[in-house]
């Protein structure tokens, strides 16, 4: 199973997180399948590769709690619903 989760980067006391698609059995710092964005909690910046995120969500990837909140704030799930309506 694939999850969308945060992978810690940066230095001490200055964490930046990459949002990655990764196998559930891998460690947090393990090898990821694909980088799909990043999140900087200090500067409150977020970059998301929305088409790639939508691809993984359509294939059944599950976001973790924090990633779910980030995607919800960016209104990614609305785009997912629009894409599903178009395909029906």
From Swiss-Prot:
Keyword Plastid listed: yes
Transmembrane annotation, as ranges: none
Keyword Lipid biosynthesis found: no
Gene Ontology MF terms: structural constituent of ribosome
Keywords: Chloroplast, Plastid, Ribonucleoprotein, Ribosomal protein
InterPro entries referenced in this protein's UniProt entry, alphabetically: Ribosomal_bS16, Ribosomal_bS16_CS, Ribosomal_bS16_dom_sf
Compartments (UniProt record): Plastid, Chloroplast
Superkingdom assignment: Eukaryota
Any one GO biological process: mitochondrial translation
Gene Ontology cellular component annotations, sorted alphabetically: chloroplast; mitochondrion; small ribosomal subunit
Family: Belongs to the bacterial ribosomal protein bS16 family.
Protein name per UniProt: Small ribosomal subunit protein bS16c
UniProt organism field: Calycanthus floridus var. glaucus
Lineage: Eukaryota, Viridiplantae, Streptophyta, Embryophyta, Tracheophyta
Gene giving rise to this polypeptide: rps16
């Amino acid at each position: 199973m694939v999850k969308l989760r945060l992978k810690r980067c940066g230095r001490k006391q200055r964490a930046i997180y990459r949002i990655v698609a990764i196998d559930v059995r891998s460690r947090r710092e393990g090898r990821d399948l694909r980088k799909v964005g990043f999140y900087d909690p200090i500067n409150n910046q977020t970059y998301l590769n929305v088409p790639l995120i939508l691809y993984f969500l359509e294939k059944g990837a599950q976001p973790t709690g924090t990633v779910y909140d980030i995607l919800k704030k960016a209104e990614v799930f609305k785009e997912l619903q629009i894409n599903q309506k178009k395909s029906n």
